[in-house]
C-alpha cells in the first residue's frame, strides 16, 4: 500500500467586512468535501483558512461604527466561524491575517524579495482627501467620465461607456468618503518586480497547475507583458507597516495570501507533529492546493507564485478555480430575495441539503453554478430521501421485527455487490479530480439499482407469506449492506447523515476502505429517520427572510441616504430634447467578452430590420455573457457611432445600478418586439 500523502489545502480568505453568503459557501463546501475525501482515504490532509482582515474598507467601516478595526474583525471572525461550523466546513485552523505569524512572514518575504532585487521604489502622484487626511484608492474617487461625461463614475473606469482612465483624468473629482475635492500629491511607493518572473510563470502556468481555460486566460496577460505591482499604501491604513518604512503599509493583497502560511504556522505551534518547513520550503514533497473563485486568479496564479519563488518558498501544486453562483438563472439579488446569507439559509434549512446540491452540480471546470430553488427541492428530496435513506427505512424494520435487529450473513445479490465494488474506484477518481457531479451521478445510479432490486424482491410482500422469513432477512440484510456502501461514498458530502447512519449501523466511523467489507451477523441499533424532505414553504420563507434582511438594512440607513441622494436628479429638460433620443427594443443575438478589455462585452443587437454592434461596460455584472443571448433589452438607437480600440460601437444599451456587480440591464415587458420604439 502506498504511503499516505501529505496535503495542505486552503480556500480563499473571506473579507472581514461582511457576512458569508451562499456564493461564498460554494467554495468552502467544495473544498471541505475534497478534504474529507482525502482524510477518509487515510491521507494527512490539513485544511486552513483565515479572515482577510486588512485594508481601507475595514478601517473606514470600523470608524463609521465607532469601534476599533480590531474589534470589528473580531466580531466578524466570530460570525464567520459560526457560519462555517454550522455548514459543516471542518477547518483544521481558521485564523486571521491580522496576526503575529502573518506580520513575521510578510516581513520575511518582503525582506527576501528586496534583498534579491525584486522590489523597486518610485514616486506616484495620487489624489489625496484633505478632510480625511488620506490618499484615495481608485474606488474611493468619483467624478465625471472624461470620455462620455457621465456623472458619478469611479476613478478607474466608466460604467456607462466602458472607458478606462487614470484617476487624474476624471473631471470634477470628489472623495467618495468625505465628499471633499481631492488634491494631487506625490508619494513614494514600493513595487514588486513581477516581470522578473515572466519566464517562470509562463512555464508554471502551463505545467498542469491550472485548468486549461484558466491558463489560456493568463496567457493573455503574460503575452502582453507583466507590469510591476504596487504593494504599498500610505497611512492611515489598517495593516502591517513595511519594515523600515514609517507610514508605509503593505497592500492587503500582499499579506492576504501569506495568510495561508500564517494560519498553517499557527496550527503547527499547537500540533507538534506538523513541520512548517516540510510543507513550505523549496523542494517540499508535500502537496499544496488552493481553491479559489475565478475573480482572483491573477493574484493566486501570477503574483503569489512569483512572490514565493522570489522569497525561496515552494509554489502551489495546483490552483483549483471555480465559477460564480447564480440563483434561479440570474445574479444573486437582494430585491428578489436570492442574495441569501449563510445564516439566513441555516435558519430555515439543513446544511446538507445545499452541500449535496452543490456536489451534484459541480464539475472540474470554471463554469458558473446555478442554484435553481425548484430543482434544489426536487433533487434533494428525490435523491437523498427518495433513494438513499429509503433503502434503510425499507429494510431496517423487518430486521428488527423478524430477527431482533441482527443482520443475517450471506450475500443475496452477488452481482449487485460486485457492481458497487467495481464502481468505487471510478467514484474515488471523480472525487480526486473534483468532478463532484460525476461522483454523485455514479452514486445515485447505484442507489437506483439497489432500490430496483429491493422493489423487485418486495420483502414487504414476502413477509406476509408463510415460510418466507429467511428470504426476507436475506434481502433486508443485503439492502442494509448496500445502504452502508452508499453512505461511505457520500460521507465527504454528508458528514452528519454519515454519523447518524454509523450510529444506526452500530459501527465505528467509516473510512473509504470499509467499502471492501460487509456486515455479517451484525446487530443494528433501532432505526431513526435520517433525513426529512425539504418543504417548499421553508424555501419560500428563506427567500422572504432575505428580502426582509434588505428591508431591515434600508430601515437602518439614515434619512436622505437613498438612491436620489447618492445620484441626484439631473436638470430639467424640454420634451423636444427627450424626443430626440430614439429608444428601441433590441434582441441580444450574441454576447461575448472583448479580448483585452476587463470591463466590456460586445453585443450584437437585432432591432428589427438591422443589426447593431454595441460595446457595453457591463462585464462585471454578467461574467457569463452567453446567458444574455435571446434576451430583450432597450437601447439608444440614434447615438452617433463611436470608434473604440476594439471596434465601432453603434449605440448604447440601457442599464441601472451603481456599477461593478450591481449593474442591471433593462428589459421591456413581455410581448415587446425588436425594433419597437420606446415612448
Curated annotation (Swiss-Prot):
Enzyme Commission identifier(s): 6.1.1.10
Cofactor: Zn(2+)
Role summary: Is required not only for elongation of protein synthesis but also for the initiation of all mRNA translation through initiator tRNA(fMet) aminoacylation.
Family per record: Belongs to the class-I aminoacyl-tRNA synthetase family. MetG type 1 subfamily.
Motif residue range(s): 'HIGH' region: 14-24
GO biological process, any: methionyl-tRNA aminoacylation
Record's subcellular location: Cytoplasm
Cellular component, GO annotation: cytosol
Domain tRNA-binding: residue ranges: 577-679
Enzyme class, UniProt record, top EC level: ligase
Annotated binding of Zn(2+), by residue: 145, 148, 158, 161
Protein name: Methionine--tRNA ligase
Organism: Pseudomonas putida (strain GB-1)
Motif position, 'KMSKS' region: 331-335
Molecular function, one GO term: methionine-tRNA ligase activity
The record's free-text note on cofactor binding: Binds 1 zinc ion per subunit.
Entry superkingdom: Bacteria
Upper taxonomic lineage: Bacteria, Pseudomonadati, Pseudomonadota, Gammaproteobacteria, Pseudomonadales
Amino acid at each position: 500500500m502506498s504511503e499516505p500523502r501529505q496535503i495542505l489545502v486552503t480556500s480563499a480568505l473571506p473579507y472581514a467586512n461582511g457576512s458569508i453568503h451562499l456564493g461564498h459557501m460554494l467554495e468552502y463546501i467544495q473544498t471541505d468535501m475534497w478534504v474529507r475525501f482525502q482524510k477518509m482515504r487515510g491521507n494527512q490532509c490539513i485544511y486552513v483558512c483565515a479572515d482577510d482582515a486588512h485594508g481601507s474598507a475595514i478601517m473606514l467601516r470600523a470608524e463609521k461604527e465607532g469601534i476599533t478595526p480590531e474589534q470589528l474583525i473580531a466580531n466578524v471572525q466570530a460570525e464567520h466561524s459560526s457560519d462555517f461550523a454550522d455548514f459543516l466546513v471542518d477547518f483544521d485552523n481558521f485564523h486571521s491575517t491580522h496576526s503575529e505569524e502573518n506580520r513575521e512572514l510578510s516581513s520575511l518575504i518582503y525582506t527576501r524579495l528586496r534583498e534579491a532585487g525584486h522590489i523597486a521604489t518610485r514616486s506616484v502622484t495620487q489624489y489625496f482627501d484633505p478632510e480625511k487626511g488620506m490618499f484615495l484608492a481608485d474606488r474611493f474617487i468619483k467624478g465625471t467620465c472624461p470620455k462620455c461625461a457621465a456623472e458619478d463614475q469611479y476613478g478607474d473606469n466608466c460604467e456607462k461607456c466602458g472607458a478606462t482612465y487614470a484617476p487624474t483624468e476624471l473631471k470634477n473629482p470628489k472623495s467618495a468618503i468625505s465628499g471633499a475635492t481631492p488634491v494631487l500629491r506625490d508619494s513614494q511607493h514600493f513595487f514588486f518586480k513581477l516581470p522578473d518572473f515572466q519566464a517562470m510563470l509562463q512555464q508554471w502556468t502551463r505545467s498542469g497547475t491550472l485548468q486549461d481555460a484558466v491558463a489560456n486566460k493568463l496567457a493573455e496577460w503574460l503575452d502582453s507583458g507583466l507590469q510591476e505591482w504596487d504593494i504599498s499604501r500610505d497611512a492611515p491604513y489598517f495593516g502591517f507597516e513595511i519594515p523600515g518604512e514609517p507610514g508605509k503599509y503593505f497592500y492587503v493583497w500582499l499579506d492576504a495570501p501569506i495568510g495561508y502560511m500564517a494560519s498553517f504556522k499557527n496550527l503547527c505551534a499547537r500540533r507538534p507533529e506538523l513541520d512548517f518547513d516540510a510543507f513550505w520550503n523549496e523542494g517540499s514533497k508535500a502537496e499544496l492546493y488552493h481553491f479559489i473563485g475565478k475573480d482572483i486568479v491573477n493574484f493566486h496564479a501570477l503574483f503569489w507564485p512569483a512572490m514565493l519563488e522570489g522569497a525561496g518558498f515552494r509554489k502551489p501544486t495546483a490552483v483549483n478555480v471555480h465559477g460564480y453562483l447564480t440563483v434561479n438563472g440570474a445574479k444573486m439579488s437582494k430585491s428578489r430575495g436570492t442574495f441569501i446569507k449563510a445564516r439566513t439559509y441555516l435558519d430555515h434549512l439543513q446544511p446538507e441539503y445545499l452541500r449535496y446540491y452543490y456536489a451534484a452540480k459541480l464539475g472540474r471546470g470554471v463554469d458558473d453554478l446555478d442554484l435553481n430553488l425548484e430543482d434544489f427541492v426536487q433533487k434533494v428530496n428525490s435523491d437523498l430521501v427518495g433513494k438513499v435513506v429509503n433503502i434503510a427505512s425499507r429494510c431496517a424494520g423487518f430486521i428488527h421485527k423478524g430477527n431482533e435487529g441482527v443482520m443475517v450473513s450471506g450475500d443475496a445479490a452477488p452481482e449487485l455487490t460486485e457492481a458497487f465494488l467495481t464502481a468505487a474506484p471510478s467514484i474515488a477518481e471523480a472525487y480526486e479530480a473534483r468532478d463532484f457531479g460525476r461522483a454523485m451521478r455514479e452514486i445515485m445510479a447505484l442507489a437506483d439499482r439497489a432500490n430496483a432490486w429491493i422493489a423487485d424482491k418486495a420483502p414487504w410482500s414476502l413477509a406476509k407469506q408463510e415460510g418466507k422469513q429467511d428470504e426476507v432477512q436475506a434481502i433486508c440484510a443485503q439492502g442494509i449492506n448496500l445502504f452502508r456502501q452508499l453512505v461511505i461514498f457520500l460521507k465527504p458530502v454528508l458528514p452528519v447523515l454519515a454519523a447518524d447512519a454509523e450510529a444506526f449501523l452500530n459501527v465505528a466511523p467509516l473510512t473509504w476502505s470499509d467499502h471492501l467489507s460487509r456486515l455479517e451477523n451484525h446487530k443494528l441499533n433501532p432505526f431513526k429517520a435520517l433525513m426529512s424532505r425539504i418543504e417548499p414553504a421553508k424555501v419560500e420563507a428563506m427567500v422572504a427572510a432575505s428580502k426582509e434582511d434588505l428591508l431591515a438594512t434600508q430601515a437602518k440607513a439614515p434619512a436622505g441616504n437613498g438612491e436620489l441622494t447618492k445620484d441626484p436628479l439631473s436638470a430639467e429638460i424640454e420634451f423636444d430634447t427627450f424626443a430626440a433620443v430614439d429608444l428601441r427594443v433590441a434582441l441580444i443575438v450574441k454576447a461575448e467578452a472583448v479580448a483585452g478589455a476587463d470591463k466590456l462585452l460586445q453585443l450584437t443587437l437585432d432591432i428589427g430590420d438591422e443589426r447593431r454592434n454595441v460595446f457595453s461596460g457591463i462585464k462585471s455584472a454578467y461574467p457569463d455573457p452567453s446567458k444574455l443571448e435571446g434576451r430583450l433589452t432597450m437601447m439608444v438607437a440614434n447615438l452617433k457611432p463611436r470608434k473604440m480600440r476594439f471596434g465601432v460601437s453603434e449605440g448604447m444599451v440601457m442599464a441601472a445600478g451603481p456599477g461593478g456587480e450591481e449593474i442591471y440591464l433593462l428589459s421591456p415587458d413581455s410581448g415587446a418586439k425588436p425594433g419597437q420604439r420606446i415612448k
